[in-house]
C-alpha cells in the first residue's frame, strides 16, 4: 500500500512536466542569476531569518557580516548549484530519474534535520521574488517557473 501511495505521489508530481519551450524559459532566466549565489542566499535569509537559523554555522550571526565570508559563499554555491542541476534537467522526460535521485537525496538530508515543508515554501517564495526582481518577468515565465517548481516541490514533499 505504501508503494502505491508513493507511486501516486510521484505520478502527480510529474503529471505536467515542463515542455521544451517552458524549460527553455526557466533555463534562460536562471542563467541570468545563477552566478549571483551569495546574493540569492542573502536575499532568502534576509526574507526568512527562520531559515537561516536552521543552519548551525549561521544561526545567531549577523547576516551582513556573514555575507562576505567564504563559508557563506561556499554554502550559497551548494544551494544554487542544486537548483542549477535541477533546472538543467527540466524539460526532458529522460532526465526524470536523475531529477528524482537529486530531489530524493536532498529531501532525505533535510528530513533528517527536521526541516518543515513550510520552510521549503518560504524558500520557494523568496527564490521567485528574487527572480522577479532580477529578470524580465512575464506571465509565460511565471507560469513556467510555477509548473517547474510545483513538479520539484511535489516530488520533494512526497519524500519528506
UniProtKB/Swiss-Prot annotation:
Any one of the GO CC terms: extracellular region
Family: Belongs to the globin family.
PROSITE patterns xrefs: GLOBIN
Source organism (scientific name): Chironomus thummi thummi
Official protein name in the record: Globin CTT-II beta
Secretion signal, residue range per the UniProt entry: 1-15
Binding-site positions, heme b: 75, 110
Any further remark recorded for this protein: There are at least 12 different components in Midge globin.
Entry-linked Pfam families: Globin
Annotated disulfide bonds: none
CDD domains hit by this protein: Mb-like
Domain Globin: 17-160
Keyword annotations from UniProtKB, A to Z: Heme, Iron, Metal-binding, Oxygen transport, Signal, Transport
One GO MF term: heme binding
Subunit structure: Homodimer.
Superkingdom of source: Eukaryota
Amino acid at each position: 500500500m505504501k508503494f502505491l501511495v508513493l507511486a501516486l505521489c510521484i505520478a502527480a508530481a510529474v503529471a505536467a512536466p515542463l515542455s521544451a519551450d517552458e524549460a527553455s524559459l526557466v533555463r534562460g532566466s536562471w542563467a541570468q542569476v545563477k552566478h549571483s549565489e551569495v546574493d540569492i542566499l542573502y536575499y532568502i535569509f534576509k526574507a526568512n531569518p527562520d531559515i537561516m537559523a536552521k543552519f548551525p554555522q549561521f544561526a545567531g550571526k549577523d547576516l551582513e557580516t556573514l555575507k562576505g565570508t567564504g563559508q557563506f559563499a561556499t554554502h550559497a554555491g551548494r544551494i544554487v548549484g542544486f537548483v542549477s542541476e535541477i533546472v538543467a534537467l527540466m524539460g526532458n522526460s529522460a532526465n526524470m530519474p536523475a531529477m528524482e535521485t537529486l530531489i530524493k537525496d536532498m529531501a532525505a538530508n533535510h528530513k533528517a534535520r527536521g526541516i518543515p515543508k513550510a520552510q521549503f515554501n518560504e524558500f520557494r517564495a523568496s527564490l521567485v521574488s528574487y527572480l522577479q526582481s532580477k529578470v524580465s518577468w512575464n506571465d509565460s515565465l511565471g507560469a513556467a517557473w510555477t509548473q517547474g517548481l510545483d513538479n520539484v516541490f511535489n516530488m520533494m514533499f512526497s519524500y519528506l
